A protein has these predicted regions:
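A glycine-rich helix->loop->beta "capping" turn
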Residues: 2-5, 23-36, 42-44
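The beta1-alpha1 cofactor-binding region of Rossmann-like NAD(H)/NADP(H)-dependent oxidoreductases
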Residues: 8-19
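A conserved hydrophobic alpha-helix of the Rossmann-fold in NAD(P)-dependent oxidoreductases
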Residues: 17-24, 143
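Hydrophobic structural elements of the Rossmann-like NAD(P)H-binding subdomain
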Residues: 35, 85, 130-133, 143
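Catalytic loop of short-chain dehydrogenase/reductase
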Residues: 40-60, 80-125
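A short, exposed helix-loop element centered on a Lys and neighboring polar residues
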Residues: 71-72, 117
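C-terminal helical subdomain
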Residues: 125, 132-133, 144-182
Length: 182
């Protein structure tokens, strides 16, 4: 069977990431699937001109840079056949123009997609697969009760990427089991 481990951590804190790594490395020698699902939405209704520097910095730290630090820290537990899932958002899509929705959030998700491409280039020679995925607007704490998607529907593509997707598919952005030009 499949065994999972949930490691809560504050991805805005290097100490918290290192503590989570210590817990994981004490329990397992290898991670098959690493899911980066951290995210904050702090700037709804703002513009890039009027969002505070603190909110912009915190959003980038949590939504993108923290996820990068998790990958870098957990790399010793990843090996050939391991998969990394970066939970992103359609807000990070810049094809056809940038989103007017929550600019700090959108920037952070565009950065996550770009990091995914860079990491794929770096990790492919090691046999590690990485992709970013938009689960859509999901009924979670962030999405709220009015969101259009169930948690199960939002998890469909991340689970496919983690378990069934061909290993040749790496460095891409996905939504509803389809590669998205972002």
């Amino acid at each position: 069977g499949i065994e999972g481990m949930f490691l809560p951590m504050d991805v805005g804190s290097d100490e918290s990431i290192l503590a989570a790594f210590s817990v994981a490395s004490a329990q397992v020698e290898r991670i098959d699937v690493l899911v980066n699902n951290a995210g904050v939405l702090l700037d709804e209704g703002k513009t890039l001109v009027n969002v505070s520097w603190e909110v912009l910095h915190r959003t980038l730290q949590i939504n993108s840079l923290g996820s990068l630090q998790v990958v870098r820290t957990f790399l010793p537990l990843l090996s050939k056949g391991s998969r990394i899932i970066m939970v992103s958002s359609a807000a990070g899509v810049i094809t056809g123009g940038v989103s007017s929705f929550a600019p700090a959030y959108a920037l952070s998700k565009t950065l996550m997609n770009t990091m995914t491409m860079h990491l794929a280039r770096d990790l492919t020679p090691k046999g590690i697969v990485i992709n970013s995925v938009s689960p859509g607007w999901v009924r979670t704490d962030m999405g709220g009760a009015g969101a259009s998607r169930s948690v199960a529907k939002g998890a469909e593509t991340p689970v496919w990427l983690a378990v069934d997707a061909p290993e040749s598919l790496t460095g891409k952005f996905w939504y509803d089991l389809k590669e998205i030009d972002w």
